[in-house]
Amino acid sequence: MQDHHSTNESFDIVVIGGGHAGCEAAITSAKLGFSTALFTINLDRIAWQPCNPAVGGPAKSQLVHEVDALGGIIGKLADKTAIQKRILNASKGPAVWALRAQTDKREYSKKMIEILQNTDNLSLKEAMITELDIAKTEEIGLNSKKIVKKRIKGVRTFFGSYYSARSVIITAGTFLEGRIWIGNKSMSAGRSGEQAAKGLTKNLHEIGIKTERLKTGTPARVDKRSIIFDELDAQPSTAADKYFSFDPNIKNNMPQVSCHITRTTTKTHQLIRDNLHLTPIYGGFIDSKGPRYCPSIEDKIVKFADKESHQIFLEPEGINTPEIYVQGFSTGLPENIQLELLRTLPGLSECKMLRPAYAVEYDYIPATQLQTSLETKEIEYLFSAGQINGTTGYEEAAAQGLVAGVNATRKLNEKDPIIFTRESSYIGTMINDLITKDLKEPYRVLTSRSEYRLTLRGDNADRRLTPLGYQIGLIDEKRWWAYQEKMNLLEEEKLRLNNTRLKNTDEISKNIELDTGSKIKGSTTLKELLKRPNFHYSDLIKYNLTEKNLGSSIQEGVEIDIKYEGYLKRQKNNIEQINRQSCKSLPQEINYEKIDTLSLEARENLNKIKPKNFGDASKIPGVSKADLTALLVWLKIREIKKEKANIFVKKSYHLKSNPSEH
């Protein structure tokens, strides 16, 4: 780096990138009392939602709840700017319930900018960072071997300004040497309409940080005034009263709108097949890996060739914009074919395309180079968070940003880092996966990745993490008081239900038996009653068996705790068993493709590698602890079936060899 005696400003922490990871990191470090500068290429596009204008969904909503429970921002902003909310997987168990909010993307960005501008200790800077300044010192290690230690000193911008920093957090998203593709044409860009970050990748290589290349994409936006809504199924907002944030003061004043559903047709599929050679991937123009769980429409047609139709969602990007996001329809096809393709969908036969779909490839830092704190192993006081670590999604980015922000401040305070474990949070599950597995495709958090998913629910994220948020200093006294009040009410109610009995001779008991079809033998506690699958907390209210008017979140928490008490104990035992089974051999003849309790990714990778034992299987990318649990259960069932078959064979042989017994 050039001579930098002319320092523009000095900061405790510099954050590079103003996306969802960068905003959480910067706000976190500033709230904890450290002078922080957030650098971004475009101050008007802070916390932008360049892909779907939505927050939450399966596992992602659990992450948002966790970030909020710790004192982060994403949940509050999603609640304040939501224009539609739905509960996904509501017919399944609470482990996979997920809140998803359609947000007004411009309002979301606007409110984040307001928060940043009004956060003490935080400065916003529009500049492109191209160099990290590193100090090197030599130390004598074991066997008198010299060790070169590297430590961050500051950053330099494209135009030469220098800022000293005690710690740096890189949250560059898709901007590092980003290139967008439409068909066989490409241009340098971090995302559509914004320049890529140039120079920093080269500098990272020079200081010992490796990068690789990934790809993602986003679908076209169409003008809602050109859509024939009569041909579509409406999907209204059904959970406007549900919140990501545990803060009781968060409210939503946004109008609620509907999304709409359409489907691909045989004409859609044929048009894609006829033009596959024009896409960046199938045409061979790029070979970067895209996200497995958010495939392009051409990937869907190729990989699921037997499927006659795919569901497509039309999602509003905001209240005051005509733009509609065509969810599930990302593509790399040329622009003219994209429009033709869109017009094969019911309701879109006359649509006008406002923005074309495009693919974007970018440099990322494989997270195996990071410690659990998200500090790089190579350079002290240098942290990395968000999509640059190989993840995909605003929620994953926000969670990493908060972790990096917390641990950068703790490093400066010479305190131990906060380590999030798999059993404590989805945040811990994600970070553990990132730093231990050599991932070659964008990582998305999934409920199936967690072996503790019944414990790591969205509704109890505050119980798991708010005490930690308070200890760190991100939860204020008012919020802490509200949390303690909620915990007291929850525990008091569980105790009351355990101590209150009903006799089968009581009039209420007779009514309950009549309504539910389940007998009450002798007497039962309200807790035992609530354990029944066809009895809910709402029934306690119905039969006037409550004492206090408890909030819906407390009612839900009480019911889940009681109903799933046994499952939670069994889950814990399964995990302990897994940890003891690392040397258990795996028969080489197993066809993992036939084990449908495994994730698709796990089946594919296990079949390819054929591990010898559980220990080897646990090291394979894409094989989660949840997959190992499922595999262990499958092997047990297999062994029981074999034992039964052997007993049957022995009995048959015994009968044949003793004909006199007949």
From Swiss-Prot:
Primary localisation category: cytoplasm
Residues holding FAD: 17-22
Domain of life: Bacteria
Biological processes annotated in GO: tRNA methylation; tRNA wobble uridine modification
InterPro entries named among the record's database cross-references: FAD/NAD-bd_sf, GIDA_C_N, MnmG, MnmG-rel, MnmG-rel_CS, MnmG_C, MnmG_C_subdom, MnmG_C_subdom_sf
GO cellular component, one term: cytoplasm
GO MF term (any one): flavin adenine dinucleotide binding
HAMAP family, per the entry: MnmG_GidA
Name this protein carries in UniProt: tRNA uridine 5-carboxymethylaminomethyl modification enzyme MnmG
Species this chain originates from: Prochlorococcus marinus (strain MIT 9312)
